[in-house]
Amino acid sequence: MGQYVIIENGGRYCYNLCASNGHVLVNSIVFPSRDECLKSIDEMRDTASTAGIEDSTEDAFDRIPSPKYRIYETMDGKYFFRFITSMAGDVARSHEYPKKESLLRRIERMRSECDSSLARQD
């Protein structure tokens, strides 16, 4: 199992979902409070394992309801996704990958590790 790691900076909070192998699966947006950050983690735990995939790199792609993984392509041909929830919208972003297949494997990894626990903080 992976871990959610909360980071605090100046009274604002974000989190990383780290896979069991230590790789960061996604980085969250910045939240104004720890409670909102924790709510986002709870929603991700509840929905990320069954969320659909919307591939905006395809011509005339079909829009699907949230929660979902929306795939994007950068100007230099790399791929990343954003995780979009039905309650809070766009809450997390993946790293960029040179191949879409690598990105799809990362989505599957996130689906299997989204119910991870919160890292212990001292």
Regions found by a protein language model. Give the residues of each.
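Short amphipathic alpha-helical linker/capping segments at the junctions of internal repeats
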Residues: P32-L38, S56-A60, K99-L104
